[in-house]
Amino acid sequence: MPEHNRRLVERTGIDVEKLLELLIKAAAAEFTTYYYYTILRNHATGLEGEAIKEIIEDARLEDRNHFEALVPRIYELGGELPRDIREFADLASCRDAYLPEEPTIENILKVLLEAERCAVGVYTEICNYTFGKDPRTYDLALAILHEEIEHEAWFEELLTGKPSGHFRRGKPGESPYVSKFLKTR
């Protein structure tokens, strides 16, 4: 299957090695973001922190879902994840979402917003690269992009107090756009 699928994508003019690099870097970013959001969520304390903990949890679980949805496509195209977790983490297309030195709620929100803005850029690039050429990867990247834009809007609204128009939330980790790509659902 990977050889046939890969040839079909290559025939459209896509450099599959470049696409795999983009997808692996995106998967690494989602994986590391899940880890760092776990730490950030645990440091969202006090009354202000309790108010945003579930929102961080929602983004964290959806980012894990993004990782889980990207991995099958990587293998379908004949790629694979690195065997070494450290090597994999170093490939992430976005900076690590480290806990800030001063872990105030405002500083945590700034880290979260920066991470989501990077993710929006990553999936916009993948969508632009695959549009009209690789419908499966495009559909997947677009679904993830929808969720990353929502995450960005959530954190921007919480940080600035200005309405974002994107405060759709269901139960944490619901992934309304990406869930169709997850094999466990």
UniProtKB/Swiss-Prot annotation:
Reaction(s) the record says it catalyses: 2 Fe(2+) + H2O2 + 2 H(+) = 2 Fe(3+) + 2 H2O
A Gene Ontology cellular-component term: nucleoid
DNA-binding found in the keyword field: yes
Top-rank EC class of the record's enzyme: oxidoreductase
SUPFAM superfamilies (alphabetical): Ferritin-like (SSF47240)
Signal peptide interval: none
Main location: cytoplasm
Residues given in the record as Fe cation binding sites: E30, H66, E116, E148, H151
Key words, A-Z: Cytoplasm, DNA-binding, Iron, Iron storage, Metal-binding, Oxidoreductase
E.C. numbers: 1.16.-.-
GO MF annotations in UniProt: DNA binding; ferric iron binding; ferroxidase activity; heme binding
GO biological process: intracellular iron ion homeostasis
CDD domains in UniProt: DPSL (cd01052)
Subcellular location: Cytoplasm, Nucleoid
NCBIfam families assigned: Arch_DPS (NF040955), PRK13456.1 (NF009990)
SUBUNIT field: Homododecamer. The 12 identical subunits form a holow sphere unto which the mineral iron core of up to 300 Fe(3+) can be deposited.
Purpose: Protects DNA from oxidative damage by sequestering intracellular Fe(2+) ion and storing it in the form of Fe(3+) oxyhydroxide mineral. One hydrogen peroxide oxidizes two Fe(2+) ions, which prevents hydroxyl radical production by the Fenton reaction. It efficiently oxidizes Fe(2+) in the presence of hydrogen peroxide and stores it.
Family: Belongs to the Dps family.
Protein name per UniProt: DNA protection during starvation protein
Species whose genome carries this gene: Pyrococcus furiosus (strain ATCC 43587 / DSM 3638 / JCM 8422 / Vc1)
Source taxonomy: Archaea, Methanobacteriati, Methanobacteriota, Thermococci, Thermococcales
Gene: dps
